[in-house]
């Protein structure tokens, strides 16, 4: 109470706070940047609103479904229960997971194969309570491992029968998730993601026949960014939905007729991307969303707030300041506090109108005068064309406090090229770890090359089945352009370091670009993507194939040039420590 704590986490990881008695104090999803989770009465209200509601007593008499010995039974008040399925087994059981139609006549359930997850050993060499080492085994599925195969099945609670659903529509799945019942109870909607992440489909299941039809299907030549860009919002007052897609080459929102899957209209369009659906007001037919690159003259990674009518008209960008923004609305959503900054611009807080974004009042400006008196210098934002000679690559440089422009300084790139996000900070901050290194006499570079997220689909596609690329042609082009502008950069002495995926990237720099990078420090790298966690690697590499070996640092270890330092934590539960040791063995 009335305290604070700091935790390290990864973008996309979710934290559930004080889970007890079905009462959540807060739910927090980590972003790509430093963020603050404020825990109070409001966070509890939001958490409980986002949580699945507790099952309500069924208002239809004698309509409860339960699982007995892996099969579905219909429970009657007279205790003359009826068995509805007979094919369930321990290895392929029906699940205690039923979604009832609005009229209570139908229920959608699932049958799923059982998968025993892979376990990996972690060696604790120096336990505190004994002399001898200990081994801990943890569940750790890896690319290519089997996935539970879920298939939907319908139940007619009036006729007390099971309605088979064609399983061919759900074969070889990564996931199969219930999403929605139609208001008239005629169809259930399920989201199907095929293994390999190259097909994502919203399927409609006829409640009376079990027939499956496509409503929306995404099947790009490369991959669907399922983990980051799956955005689906049902419009309760109509049989319509909002669906996000990169079919235009940019991540945008579309209004879909849920009765037939036809696109009613694009809601957003242009050479920018929707980052998140923030709020939908069905009464006024307006959707609020966050966007990147919506101000073409700003850094394309600056986050802005906008709104647009569901028919695609009256697009209004509500934030204007040349920086990245975060916001908080009043309960009536008539006003919002807009906080924005850049790496080279302290934070500004403004009160704005939610109607048109007009400024009501400036609330505060961050004062860094004391910091400047201590010799603090702003990061130098810089952009230059990448490998294609036209796509702009963005990053920044951090220089030593006492930089002598008549000297030349070795350069160290701090790399993390994970395709789930972009990784160059955009808001104002001290960049303490990089500054400490700069004060030793280096210039530190942070760059987002092609293959990272939240630009165009083409920009992102460079990562597909090719994590070894890591945007290096763009990074090298950026550094060479920076050296032409800043004569104190010495590109004959370029080093690189990173951890996790950044550890993989750092070693890859010496293996594939040893003529440019002369030294690397690689911490806990996922050096062979077949050794790392299943979800992250299959998201960008797809199914197991020869391309995994081609991106493996272990496979290419014989190409090593320059000086390499490897570090690893023996109890690392995020990246299998064996990944680093296999690199050592390959040398």
PLM feature spans:
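Serine-hydrolase catalytic core recognition
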Residues: 185, 191, 324-587
